[in-house]
């Protein structure tokens, strides 16, 4: 890494800081909520279920009889999760993943709204009653209250709500023994001309429970999103006491809510009428989200049936990619036109390939850093040679610049001729850094949100997805943070060494300033980033130092063509001679 490279990296670090601070997604303005709203009361207690018939009729209309009953729970246990369903609403009340623990290394429930459940149908009937099926008691058609399955075995849970002899709602869940995906079927009988707008909404309400120790960091990744018309639509509820809403018409590929590492997605099997997203930030950094699909109920059909797929599980790129629904678009890999291709087609495939025979992600990161260094070696070699030539020419170039300071056109002409004869590019030192910028940003996004690194340790780092802290202060130091991480310190040392052995065209004052400022800047920047990212750049710098020693031993300033040195000397001498003759 030459001095121009150092300057380039400093600029990159500054850009990344500014990006993190100011380039967050646009927040949606608050809009009137014209959709049917769910009941805001908590789970109805036994006393409320016995409310007077007149009150229930006023609230639920023709659904009044279904507003009372006894709740029955069903547990489905497959290889990947344990899910609890409730007959009250035919909803999902709990999802506990088996292969993923929380930040305390304990099992955790992804469903945040345990009392009322997360999944429901929402509609406005012709009586003007806003109905959320979580307030209604379905009949459990299936007999088994506990179903355990594995492999390709299938389990089915059926619910039915008989409203009157002409109207009914059927909901069916189908589970596979080894998949996060759940098939979900809705059948509405006798609802033609019974719903306002001839539509209903399938919604996931409450977002997802947080799982990480750093709630503030997790809130930065929590959002509600939809894939609509080939584009990602999302809302991020970043401000307290403000409700964010987004409502659009059109055919959706999915709607979803996510936290840092997990997602709950509703994927329609037929055409949708549109989507609705809502979010608000509560206390303790928790952000509550709602995502719904709008489905049509034709007025000419007595029976309206829709099939959906539910995905409730990890945001693992390879796993969600198999759904073939573009759900991977909800994963933030930066700019679609620049960093995302590097993440999807370089970093993640290489990591997946190496993980096939290397189980330790720390070793995978080290090998990946070595591979990148080998790939960029030709650029580094060319850059160093160019810088050494520039260093040899520098004394004469400075004198030439001084002599032609009043004639910029002549100066550029002479410099261009000298550079050409010397075979150097004054910007050649920056080329390796510039070409690595997309990869650098892509690594930042992948390491920040990749579940592959989560709870995988290396050396003293217990978790490569968070900083490798060895000491927590209990208070935060501005810019630096509230802890001491080791990888950034070691990386700062390697940056210092690398600068000491790298050729430079800078003045002594510039060199001394960058020699100390840049390592400190990198230390401050990386102290709060994932340990995996710090390990990558530490090892990349170690390999760079070794490479620089090798390049220094195999190149010299003698590579500068004699003609270039003579041209530079002649240009300076010519200017001096002209200056003397004028006197």
UniProtKB/Swiss-Prot annotation:
Cross-referenced InterPro entries: Membr_insert_YidC, Membr_insert_YidC_N, YidC/ALB3/OXA1/COX18, YidC/Oxa/ALB_C, YidC_ALB_C, YidC_periplasmic_sf
Classification lineage: Bacteria, Pseudomonadati, Chlorobiota, Chlorobiia, Chlorobiales
Membrane-protein topology: Multi-pass membrane protein
UniProt GO BP: protein insertion into membrane; protein transport
Species: Chlorobium limicola (strain DSM 245 / NBRC 103803 / 6330)
Reported function: Required for the insertion and/or proper folding and/or complex formation of integral membrane proteins into the membrane. Involved in integration of membrane proteins that insert both dependently and independently of the Sec translocase complex, as well as at least some lipoproteins. Aids folding of multispanning membrane proteins.
UniProt gene name: yidC
Major subcellular location class: membrane
Subcellular location: Cell inner membrane
Region (Disordered): 28-50
Quaternary structure annotation from Swiss-Prot or TrEMBL: Interacts with the Sec translocase complex via SecD. Specifically interacts with transmembrane segments of nascent integral membrane proteins during membrane integration.
GO cellular component assignments: plasma membrane
Family membership: Belongs to the OXA1/ALB3/YidC family. Type 1 subfamily.
Regions of compositional bias (Polar residues) in chain numbering: 37-46
Protein name in UniProt: Membrane protein insertase YidC
Keywords associated with the record: Cell inner membrane, Cell membrane, Chaperone, Membrane, Protein transport, Transmembrane, Transmembrane helix, Transport
Listed HAMAP family: YidC_type1 (MF_01810)
Keyword Transmembrane: yes
